């Protein structure tokens, strides 16, 4: 690697590359979430028969992973670059390796391994066959072929590629701490994110109001159900995301027991499943508008029989 790309140049390079592969460039979704997979641009679009190719950066919050800015690679909030392609291209791994070349990483000169790591997200009823991608001993990407999302079997199968941008940038720039990553020329990652990292860690572990969070969870759950009763999928899913983040804050605070934890996850999962079913029904009612005419006619005719 000759030129060391800045963090924002890595993002721009990946955006241009996946745009060239036919992906729409979406923007980060404006609700807290623990992973790019939970964005409606993945969770909702991975289900149902319609094609979907998208790429986007997703800031991902994991309160329990906060370390007050003292750990060089463990963060309350990190950034993922998410690629979802449905149906999955047969050459998705080759496309991924070519993306690394665009970043200046020649696969022939590095030890790149696909290590089996099947994926599951219990809180959304989602699972798939997966691999971690290791670059010279460091995990930089998660590869997943979704088999189930929101409790529904996926058909066609969606391929998801999730780059860990901080890890990738640390490798490309040869720095040991994420806070030393150059975000833009002359501006370090730590100059932007170190103080927020400390403050969010302090809040998550020491300051959050447990009673308020417990009350909020109940309210968000009820509001999601109320929206679903009216067939309002997207507002309902927003409240599912709020439930998830509220639970993560409670979990980080140590406010839920092991038994209660399983119960909260089940409650979020039940909502996510209803959202998924309602979304597919909504798309069907619209006539699956992203399908080509021939496939749409066949599917709708089958359902009418």
UniProtKB/Swiss-Prot annotation:
InterPro entries recorded: aa-tRNA-synth_II/BPL/LPL, Gly-tRNA-synth_heterodimer, Gly-tRNA_ligase_asu
The EC number(s) this enzyme carries: 6.1.1.14
Molecular functions per Gene Ontology: ATP binding; catalytic activity, acting on a protein; glycine-tRNA ligase activity; transferase activity
Known catalytic reactions: tRNA(Gly) + glycine + ATP = glycyl-tRNA(Gly) + AMP + diphosphate
The entry's keywords: Aminoacyl-tRNA synthetase, ATP-binding, Cytoplasm, Ligase, Nucleotide-binding, Protein biosynthesis
GO biological process per UniProt: glycyl-tRNA aminoacylation
Subcellular location: Cytoplasm
Signal peptide: none
GO cellular component: cytosol
Domain of life: Bacteria
Record's subunit section: Tetramer of two alpha and two beta subunits.
PANTHER family cross-referenced by the UniProt entry: GLYCINE--TRNA LIGASE, CHLOROPLASTIC_MITOCHONDRIAL 2, GLYCYL-TRNA SYNTHETASE
Family listed: Belongs to the class-II aminoacyl-tRNA synthetase family.
The protein, known as: Glycine--tRNA ligase alpha subunit
Lineage: Bacteria, Bacillati, Bacillota, Bacilli, Lactobacillales
